[in-house]
Amino acid sequence: MPYDKKAVHFGGGNIGRGFVAEFLHNSGYEVVFVDVMDSIIEALQKQSSYTVTEIGDDGEREFTIDHYRALNSKHEMDKVVQEIASADVVTCAVGPNILKFVAEPVAKAIDARTLDYPIAVIACENAINATTTWRGFIEGKLSEDSKSNLDKKARFANSAIDRIVPVQDKDAGLNVKIEKFYEWCVEQKPFENGGKKPDVKGIHYVDDLEPYIERKLFTVNTSHATAAYYGHQAKKQYIHEVLQDKKLHDIVRDAVKETAHLIVSKHGVSVQEQNDYVDSIIKRISNPVLKDNVERVGRAPLRKLSRKERFVGPAAQLAERGEKVDALLGAIEQAYLFQNVEGDEESAELAKILKENSAEEVVTKVNGLDKSHPLFEKILPIVKKVQGGS
């Protein structure tokens, strides 16, 4: 089947296959996967299709994803560049720390691009303004000619994505189980004045992305991670088990009550609307059908404890406003206790940092706060307590 639209997607993982590629495929795009994992690319090259199963309260729905191709960027970089140079859209779901490694092929493709409209560049990461970050890495590798007329060659749009992908069955192969709920918001201003807005069913284009990013990150990710870190200490296996425990359920609620206060006061969202949103999120992450593993949700604690992330991000803004942050501080303490968890490098690195640095150095290094910030003095005793093992 010939396609008149093409999207290149970096990252053949569950979010890439089960969310981004599903939407692109269902919107009539031929999808070209790019990854460095030999096993994923070989499987995609061998199999002509895979299944995405959406899990909801009302049961399951299956979708077949086909008519895709796959390239290994370790061995086929020239082909990757050619594909991007002739694509309508390039997306990624590789993890915020990997963005710098997927910049060069995009830069080379922009340099080589001869089409009379710009490619749309959209990062689909759990991070604020990830496309802007990716753009910085890409621009650092562009020719001077491309830099001088970049608007004609590429448009960069930040996005906010929200969809829970639970731990997959061991024998799932390429098939992905994913929750039915989704949100994919993309800023539309970058596509004005000569840009070509991707026609993707399910994307919600918005003028100002920040309220959507912060609402999602400081509600979904904050509640999810709070449940995971408290659940890990309570020896729970799944997130829904954490939330079935009334004491832990109330603790998670308290954390997102604090972030809700920020969302309402900063972005002008009504109290009722934010409360309804919080209720819907707690219901989502409480779904036992997802079998959402506590250790999976808790992994990468260093990133999750960083300055603009789900705990310190909202807590810092609230502290600057003189508002209450007690529940968020509790979650931060639990995150600091997520150390030396099997299969998670960051949890081992966190333990090392706590062992080798003073409490002041830890707060600066891990949380990105200097001593003058009002949150610094609130986190400092937590770190001292964790270091002391009390």
Curated annotation (Swiss-Prot):
Catalyses which reaction(s): D-mannitol 1-phosphate + NAD(+) = beta-D-fructose 6-phosphate + NADH + H(+)
The enzyme's E.C. designation: 1.1.1.17
Keyword Repressor: no
Gene3D superfamilies associated with the record: N-(1-d-carboxylethyl)-l-norvaline Dehydrogenase, domain 2 (1.10.1040.10), NAD(P)-binding Rossmann-like Domain (3.40.50.720)
A Pfam family of this chain: Mannitol_dh_C
Keyword Oxidoreductase: yes
Annotated GO MF terms: mannitol-1-phosphate 5-dehydrogenase activity
Keywords: NAD, Oxidoreductase
Binding sites annotated in the UniProt record for NAD(+): A7, V8, H9, F10, G11, G12, G13, N14, I15, G16, R17, G18
Catalytic residue list: K216
A cellular-component GO term for this protein: cytosol
Example of a GO biological process term: mannitol catabolic process
UniProt superkingdom: Eukaryota
Family the entry assigns: Belongs to the mannitol dehydrogenase family.
Role, per record: Catalyzes the NAD(H)-dependent interconversion of D-fructose 6-phosphate and D-mannitol 1-phosphate in the mannitol metabolic pathway. Required for the process of sporulation on senescing leaf material.
Subunit structure: Monomer.
PANTHER family noted in UniProt: ALTRONATE OXIDOREDUCTASE-RELATED, MANNITOL-1-PHOSPHATE 5-DEHYDROGENASE
HAMAP family assigned: Mannitol_dehydrog
Record protein name field: Mannitol-1-phosphate 5-dehydrogenase
